Every structure is written in structure tokens, then in C-alpha cells.
Regions:
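Short, membrane-interfacial amphipathic segments enriched in basic
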Residues: 1-41, 218-219, 223
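Active-site cofactor/substrate anionic-group-binding motifs, chiefly glycine-
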Residues: 46-102, 106
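Selective transmembrane-helix segments that form parts of the transport pathway or gating/packing helices
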Residues: 51, 55, 59, 98, ...
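Hydrophobic positions within alpha-helical transmembrane segments of bacterial inner-membrane proteins
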Residues: 63, 67, 105, 109-110, ...
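Membrane-interfacial helix-loop-helix connectors in multipass membrane proteins
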Residues: 72-95, 160-205, 209, 213-235, ...
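A hydrophobic alpha-helix feature that marks transmembrane segments and, especially
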Residues: 105-123
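Short cytoplasmic-facing helical segments at TM-TM junctions of multi-pass membrane proteins
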Residues: 119-144, 226-229
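Helical hairpin unit composed of two closely spaced alpha helices linked by a short loop
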Residues: 233-251
Length: 254
């Protein structure tokens, strides 16, 4: 009983320490966000890495998700003679929920791991210490450009993913489910509201912030050795994915 209590207390203290480190890390990002110098080259490099190079995986995932969603909604709607709801539900479901969440998870798997591994390797090989020696703030040089790039790039990816997902539903709806092309498009557009699109883009910005902060945070606290880099990469992806799902719930409820 005493051992169990001690272990529980130790886990609680470790959790408090972790949360405290994360809060301090976020505060350091905020204090360096708008303070010169601005490393534009690192920023544009991060835009390409996070946005452009993530486009194929987000596009492919969204297309097949939209197609599968159309098939499932049609199968369910056919039981109640409500097949006509397929276009509108596919559009709303992709734009409000599935597009942002799946896009965020795909980017988290690709980008959070990449950021954590890159910064973790720099930490292990003492390149971060070299930046400090050269009077360069590591947060300013390594973290801030990636955070800003992710906050700007992920909503764009979400918007593109939404469009491709709706296109996937359209292709399946018109080729496999015998929907009329014009009617499918009209029903998809008519039931979408501006807030549906805006809420998905807001989620994308929040998810981008989560992905970049988690990747940078675990990379900066990486322990020595290859094992430490692997652990940092795993922790970044898992934490970012869990936080994305949690944030999605609260943003949907708000």
C-alpha cells in the first residue's frame, strides 16, 4: 500500500513538473514571437516542410475519407429512404470534423516527428548549446519560425483537404451511387454555411499550434543518445495526436 501510494505520488509530481515545463516553454515562445531578429529563411523553409510537403498525404487521406463517408451515409440513409442527404452530410462532415481532424493527425504524424527528431538531434549533438554560445536564442531561431509556419500552413492544408474530401464524395456519389452530377454539387454547396468553413479553419490553426509546440518541446528536452531522440519523437507524435482530439472536442462544443 505504501509502495502504491509512493508510486502514485511520484507520477503526480512528474505530471506537475511536465505541465510546468510546458507552460514555461509556451511562455518563452510568446515572449520571443514578435521580438526581432526574424529568421525569415527558417520560416519559409518550415512553410515548405510543414505545408507543401504534407499536401500529398493530406490529399490522399481526405479523398478516400470523403468517398468512404459517402458510401456509409448512403448505406445508412437507404434504410430510411433518405439517400438524398448524402451530399450535404458529406460536405458538412468533411468541413467541420473529418477534414480538420484527419488532416491534423496526418500532419502530426509527419511533422511533429520530424521536428522532434531534428531538434532532438541538434540537442544531443550540442548544436543547441553552440547557438547559445553564439548569442542566438534557440527558442527564437528553432521554435518560433516553426510555430508560426504551422499555424499558417495547417489551415491551408485543412481547406485543401476539405475540398478534396468533398470531391472524393462527389466522385463516389456520381459513379457508384448514381447521383446526378449537378444535383450532388447543388446539395453539397447549399447546406454549407460560412461558419462551417471558418470553424474548420480555426481548428486547423489550433492543431498547427499544437503540432509545432509538441514537436519543438519534446525535441528541446531530448535526452542524450539515439534512444533519447526516438523517445522524443514518439512522445511528440502521441502527445500531439491526443491533444488534437481533445482540442477538437472542446472547439466543437464551444
Amino acid at each position: 500500500m505504501i509502495r502504491l501510494t509512493a508510486r502514485t505520488g511520484r507520477l503526480f509530481l512528474e505530471l506537475c513538473s511536465f505541465v510546468g515545463e510546458l507552460i514555461i516553454f509556451c511562455f518563452r515562445i510568446l515572449t520571443n514571437l514578435l521580438v526581432p531578429p526574424f529568421f525569415l529563411r527558417a520560416f519559409f523553409s518550415s512553410i515548405i516542410q510543414i505545408g507543401w510537403l504534407s499536401l500529398p498525404v493530406v490529399g490522399i487521406t481526405s479523398f478516400f475519407t470523403g468517398g468512404a463517408l459517402a458510401l456509409q451515409i448512403y448505406a445508412g440513409g437507404a434504410r430510411f429512404n433518405a439517400e438524398e442527404v448524402v451530399p450535404s452530410i458529406v460536405a458538412i462532415g468533411m468541413v467541420r470534423e473529418l477534414g480538420p481532424v484527419l488532416g491534423g493527425l496526418m500532419v502530426a504524424a509527419r511533422v511533429a516527428s520530424s521536428i522532434a527528431a531534428e531538434i532532438g538531434t541538434m540537442k544531443v549533438t550540442e548544436q543547441v548549446d553552440a547557438l547559445i554560445t553564439l548569442s542566438t536564442e534557440p527558442i527564437k531561431y528553432l521554435v518560433v519560425p516553426r510555430v508560426i509556419a504551422a499555424v499558417l500552413a495547417v489551415p491551408v492544408l485543412v481547406g485543401v483537404g476539405d475540398s478534396i474530401g468533398v470531391l472524393g464524395g462527389y466522385v463516389i456519389g456520381t459513379t457508384r451511387l448514381d447521383f446526378n452530377n449537378a444535383i450532388y454539387l447543388i446539395n453539397s454547396i447549399n447546406y454549407l454555411e460560412f461558419w462551417d468553413v471558418l470553424s474548420g479553419l480555426i481548428k486547423g490553426a489550433v492543431f498547427g499550434c499544437i503540432i509545432s509546440v509538441m514537436g519543438c518541446f519534446f525535441g528541446m528536452r531530448c535526452e542524450k543518445g539515439a534512444r533519447g531522440v526516438g523517445q522524443a519523437t514518439k512522445s511528440a507524435v502521441v502527445s500531439a495526436s491526443v491533444l488534437i482530439l481533445a482540442a477538437n472536442y472542446f472547439l466543437t462544443e464551444a
